[in-house]
Amino acid sequence: MRESLKNSKRLVIKVGTSTLMYGNGHINLRTIEKLAMVLSDLRNEGKEVILVSSGAIGVGCHKLQLPVRPTSIPEQQAVASVGQSELMHIYSKFFGEYGQVVGQVLLTRDVTDFPISRENVMNTLESLLERGIIPIVNENDTVAVEELEHVTKYGDNDLLSAIVAKLVQADLLIMLSDIDGFYGSNPSTDPDAVMFSEINQITPEIEALAGGKGSKFGTGGMLTKLSAASYCMNANQKMILTNGKNPTIIFDIMQGEQIGTLFASKKEEFSHDGTH
């Protein structure tokens, strides 16, 4: 099935805050520049690319020199407002170095829940892609309360990226994280942890491995990634979870190399488009 990834034309790339920021709260400019280069080159190759990016609050905290993330919703939304503007400025600068135009698309869950607004979003994304523009999608943190309260509607944009992938009928969602893939145990504490190369079904056993509340492995981060993977698989789409510290790994994925964990239902192999 990995070989079929070479045929992927429309890609959604999701990058999380942990990939965009250093642990000390500063912006990881090296990773962002590499990401801009990789995605711009994929466009040069003829691929259609959508970037789903977190990081508004993290970048806002850096811009405003806040040592810790604010706890109140109004403060978080104010920080997100500053951070989103700064984040797009950084993206525009780096993508511009490679001659690639980007466009901002901010979404909230209700927009994708209602048919008319969902259709508008689809039309906007299609229009951007037709013009060779890379849409940069983020949740609109200045108005979206649920994620800020950690009732996780989108869960650091994990689910949002899967929803976007379905909206545009993407061939592949690549989720760049701070972990190499999906493991049977915590690789940071278990030196013998084994990574899954491919998962064809999200079973209760797989969910249990991701960890739940109170487990030392999961704070919910991996669970939201599994939810996104399940959403993709139910839509007959493929998702790869891999480490985003070096975005050039995307080139290797597109060559069919065994990188990260591929989530794909078995029925996906027999999809109607004949490319798989």
UniProtKB/Swiss-Prot annotation:
GO terms of molecular function: ATP binding; glutamate 5-kinase activity
Catalysed reactions listed for this entry: L-glutamate + ATP = L-glutamyl 5-phosphate + ADP
GO BP, sorted A to Z: L-proline biosynthetic process; proline biosynthetic process
Enzyme class: transferase
EC nos: 2.7.2.11
Residue positions binding ATP: K14, S177, D178, T219, G220, G221, M222, L223, T224, K225
Compartments, as annotated in UniProt: Cytoplasm
GO CC annotation: cytosol
Binding site for substrate: S54, D141, N157
Domain of life assignment: Bacteria
Main location: cytoplasm
Annotated metabolic or biological route of this protein: Amino-acid biosynthesis; L-proline biosynthesis; L-glutamate 5-semialdehyde from L-glutamate: step 1/2
Pfam families xrefs: AA_kinase
Record key words, sorted: Amino-acid biosynthesis, ATP-binding, Cytoplasm, Kinase, Nucleotide-binding, Proline biosynthesis, Transferase
Family listed: Belongs to the glutamate 5-kinase family.
NCBIfam families reported for this sequence: proB (TIGR01027)
Biological function: Catalyzes the transfer of a phosphate group to glutamate to form L-glutamate 5-phosphate.
Stated name of the protein: Glutamate 5-kinase
Lineage: Bacteria, Bacillati, Bacillota, Bacilli, Bacillales
Gene coding for it: proB
